[in-house]
């Protein structure tokens, strides 16, 4: 159509999947595998997962048992059913990344979390549960939903919820940085900018050379 598409935000995995042409297949639950993993402690689960999918740990939450078991389930299925093969890239992407000093990034993460909580995210999770979404389902929606759900169940205090979330989101951001560096090694160069410089980004878009 002669239009320039923009893909903004999201995780490194989302961007990588678009640029490298992943085809994702639904992965069924594996009851026998889950039963076998029941006796594994967290460290054993991590080692097992990384042994079958070494390059995935930057995008996967290795701190939560259920998510880690699901990641193993997906990795095992993908190994036996290689349906997520890569297609050749039909585009020449221009990837722009915003680079911030570590302390500034941490400050922004904390501020964003405070803003979301003050804007009513706790009430949103409570409302979803009141409408019939069970706690297990809510915890699968992401970090914020997981720990807000635990707070609403009186498993942790408000302060514990905030501190855990702040730490986990920072850890996730660090893993994303590692993922983006890996994209460059895989042939997807990223043009890094010091902060959100809109004019510099516009110049780069208009004249990528």
Question: What role is predicted for each listed range?
Answer:
Residues 1-209:
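Phosphate/pyrophosphate-binding catalytic cores of soluble transferases and nucleic-acid-acting enzymes
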